[in-house]
């Protein structure tokens, strides 16, 4: 279903078209449903699209129709820039579980550990609780208390060009998110989930911890690069009981910094730090530069570490290990970026996810047509249109195509067009966040009302 509005400079004229067509659509098709607040969201998106189109291609923006689909599944994905893969921060959302199936936020776990350190009659449990308490304090600067938004935001999303880099992880019992086809990925980085445990002796007992994930390096190139040397900070360790990869005791080596093959563009390259799950972006044109990291958590870090970190304690070498707790690590992208897995989009990766994903900008399906064309407005009763409406995808109007993106890193020449999609993606992400916060407030009010009702029974 298409919403159309002509894009003159007069905003009031646009609103008249909007009101008329939306009114006609809703009464002609009562089954039409959309999860977003249609009037304000679409009006803002249409205005933003027209202003961005006018800035990048004024000849097309002058006297044109802008059309946006009302379907909740009709969205277009554009691969994110290579720099976004190396510099975009992500947030950590941590939950914990004990022998019971309940999950606890980190602040409740810290309270539990404080009590265990002081009151537990078992000295080994006191030591384990003290270690975990230190661990959570170490992670607290990166933990986001805002509830993450899980589940697919959109389905049946199309990506008209191949992404320069995809990330794949296979878990037989994982949460399936979707799989991009090989034709949609120029290069795929494969992650291996841990299948073993690490044993660490702490005083008089042994601690068993879920091992770290790893990166399949078969198709990566060892170019003996020194770009990872001294450039891995900031860095965090999710295994504080082991030597930290961020400490001076474990200096990075050139062999851990591998090149992602990119035959289409030799002026830019992506280097993968396989020990710290970090990506470095290098512009190799003179003078050679490298973008600094804004956060120790990158999209690759999130994809690799999103999982469950289990901890068991063993009092003696011959006793059966007992489960202490499990940390569930979940990560969310910054506003404006999304994980595209198959045809579904996500803002957050759940623990133990499985699939093949890439980073994208996400926008509603927007098309435009020449202002001299007559676009039919749906009547109160559905009628079959006799003429095909000549609509052009916004992507091609901005000069983006498979040939210009070149299936690789070299999209600097069309950065203006990509920035247009970044702005639209930020707009969409902000709307999703606003809706989520509104629903959270409503849920809190419902919970409060339910508590009052129970007290008055």
From Swiss-Prot:
Pfam family, one: TLV_coat
Subcellular location: Virion
Miscellaneous section: Ortholog of the human HERV-H_2q24.3 envelope protein.
Domain text: The CKS-17 immunosuppressive domain is present in many retroviral envelope proteins. As a synthetic peptide, it inhibits immune function in vitro and in vivo.
Mod. after translation: Specific enzymatic cleavages in vivo yield the mature SU and TM proteins. The CXXC motif is highly conserved across a broad range of retroviral envelope proteins. It is thought to participate in the formation of a labile disulfide bond possibly with the CX6CC motif present in the transmembrane protein.
Protein's UniProt name: ERV-H1 provirus ancestral Env polyprotein
Protein family: Belongs to the gamma type-C retroviral envelope protein family. HERV class-I H env subfamily.
Lineage: Eukaryota, Metazoa, Chordata, Craniata, Vertebrata
Positions annotated with a glycan in the UniProt record: 10, 47, 197, 222, 265, 283, 352, 370
Fusion peptide, as annotated region: 388-408
Site (Cleavage): 387-388
């Amino acid at each position: 279903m298409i919403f159309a509005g002509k894009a003159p400079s007069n905003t009031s004229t646009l609103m008249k078209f909007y009101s008329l067509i939306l009114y006609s659509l809703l009464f002609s098709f009562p089954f039409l449903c959309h999860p977003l607040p249609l009037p304000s969201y679409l009006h803002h998106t249409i205005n933003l699209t027209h202003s961005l189109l006018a800035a990048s291609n004024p000849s097309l923006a002058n006297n044109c129709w802008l059309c946006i689909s009302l379907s909740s599944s009709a969205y277009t994905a554009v691969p994110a820039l290579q720099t976004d893969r190396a510099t975009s921060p992500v947030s950590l959302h941590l939950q914990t579980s004990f022998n019971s199936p309940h999950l606890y936020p980190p602040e409740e776990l810290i309270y539990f550990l404080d009590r265990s350190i002081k009151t537990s009659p078992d000295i080994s449990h006191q030591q384990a609780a003290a270690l975990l308490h230190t661990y959570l304090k170490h992670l607290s600067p990166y933990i986001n208390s805002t509830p993450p938004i899980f589940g697919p935001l959109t389905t049946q999303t199309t990506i008209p060009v191949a992404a320069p880099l995809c990330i794949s992880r296979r878990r037989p019992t994982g949460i399936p998110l979707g799989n991009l086809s090989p034709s949609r990925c120029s290069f795929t980085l494969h992650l291996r989930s841990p299948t073993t445990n690490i044993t660490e002796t702490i005083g008089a007992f042994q601690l068993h911890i879920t091992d770290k994930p790893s990166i399949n390096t078969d198709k990566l190139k060892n170019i003996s690069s020194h770009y990872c040397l001294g450039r891995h900070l900031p860095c965090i360790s999710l295994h504080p009981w082991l030597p930290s990869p961020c400490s001076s005791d474990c200096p990075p080596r050139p062999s851990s910094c591998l090149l992602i093959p990119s035959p289409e563009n030799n002026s830019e390259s992506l280097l993968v730090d396989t020990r710290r799950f970090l990506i470095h972006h290098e512009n190799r044109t003179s003078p050679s530069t490298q973008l600094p990291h804004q956060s120790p958590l990158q999209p690759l870090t999130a994809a690799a570490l999103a999982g469950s970190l289990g901890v068991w304690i063993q009092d003696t070498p011959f006793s059966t290990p007992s489960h202490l707790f499990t940390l569930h690590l979940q990560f969310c992208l910054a506003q404006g970026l999304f994980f595209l897995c198959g045809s579904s989009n996500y803002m957050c990766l759940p623990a133990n996810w499985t699939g093949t994903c890439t980073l994208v900008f996400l926008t509603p399906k927007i098309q435009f047509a020449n202002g001299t064309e007559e676009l039919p407005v749906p009547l109160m009763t559905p009628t079959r249109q006799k003429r095909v409406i000549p609509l052009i995808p916004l992507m091609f109007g901005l000069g983006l195509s498979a040939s210009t993106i070149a299936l690789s890193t070299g999209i600097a020449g069309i950065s203006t067009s990509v920035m247009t999609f970044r702005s639209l993606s930020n707009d969409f992400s902000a709307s999703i966040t606003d809706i989520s916060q509104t629903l959270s407030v409503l849920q809190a009010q419902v919970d409060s009302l339910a508590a009052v009702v129970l007290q008055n029974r």
